[in-house]
Amino acid sequence: MTDLDLDWQLEELENGRLIPESNVVELCQRVRDILIEESNIQWISSPVTICGDIHGQLHDLLELFRIGGSCPGTKYLFLGDFVDRGFYSVETFLLLLTLKCKYPKEMTLIRGNHESRQITQVYGFYDECVRKYGSANVWRYCCEIFDYLSLGALVDGKVFCVHGGLSPSISSIDQIRLLDRKQEVPHEGAMCDLLWSDPEDISGWGLSPRGAGFLFGADVSEVFNRANDLSFIARAHQLVMEGYKIHFSDKDKQYPKFTNEEDSELDSDSASPVDDSPAPGDIITIPEKDKGSVVTVWSAPNYCYRCGNVASILQLDENQTQSFKIFGTASQERSGIPTKRPIADYFL
């Protein structure tokens, strides 16, 4: 293999410029060699910052790094769904692969349901690769990388991280380690469920309206957590307007928010109602007594450039303290949204 200038690649991709196809080939070969040595469940030590769906929103990914810290100073775990729907899936995925190549221990990437040949041919990544590179070659290289991504991660042996959720076929994390992950995402079975399932306020298991995976209730997650000695499950997969969600908590309440700006002093007579919705700059720490058995992290602000949601990253310290850092979309000058361009059908 020839030497890759990873710093040059990072600069090009961060500025929304494509790297040559020959660089993509070598980058994918190098990352494949790294991933093939990784387990189905990657062990990660805290502190770590956990990130949810990105969906090709490159400039919002750069905003995430701005507020979360640059790698390798900050250790990152991304929960999949790097591509599709956004305008810059190619640059987004290649940027993350370049970081993985340069900092393999500080950048962990696991598979989402959109890291799939079938799904990317429907929701945009395939078409984007063909449009930007003139053929489907880059898409094929990336799809091979999809097959080698881990299915989950375990932080300090206490926090199970997965893209979607649980499976009725899986009662222990050791069972996940035995799965053959180096394949296209199956239409059913344990591997499919891990990438597609969702928590829901039901008892036991339910059919998923997605047509893949399952819905699972608080009782299911509590049994799984107890059997595997887990504190909680961290997952992504679902748009959350507030950027994060605590599932199956005994407490339904607003949590204290801390901003980087000093709060203004208001006397009681002049105080006006306060909007308790999370806002960019807020840091929300969940009290131990109010933790749920499952949390959702969503990291694509203003999803599809029209949903109006904020996003979050989950910062875990050595005690598994949950601190959600809220952020919004990149400024208009840096957002990179093409102008005078119709929204493709797959956004609707």
Swiss-Prot record:
Cofactor info, note text: Binds 2 manganese ions per subunit.
SMART domains reported in the protein's UniProt record: PP2Ac
Catalyzed reaction equations: O-phospho-L-seryl-[protein] + H2O = L-seryl-[protein] + phosphate; O-phospho-L-threonyl-[protein] + H2O = L-threonyl-[protein] + phosphate
Modified-residue entries (Phosphoserine), positions: S272
Keywords annotated in UniProt: Cytoplasm, Hydrolase, Manganese, Metal-binding, Methylation, Nucleus, Phosphoprotein, Protein phosphatase
UniProt cross-references to Pfam families, sorted A to Z: Metallophos (PF00149)
Annotated spans, Disordered: 259-282
SUPFAM superfamilies (UniProt xref): Metallo-dependent phosphatases (SSF56300)
Record: active site: H114 (proton donor)
Known EC number: 3.1.3.16
GO terms for cellular component: cytoplasm; cytosol; nucleus; protein phosphatase 4 complex
Homology family: Belongs to the PPP phosphatase family. PP-1 subfamily.
Protein name, UniProt field: Putative serine/threonine-protein phosphatase C26H8.05c
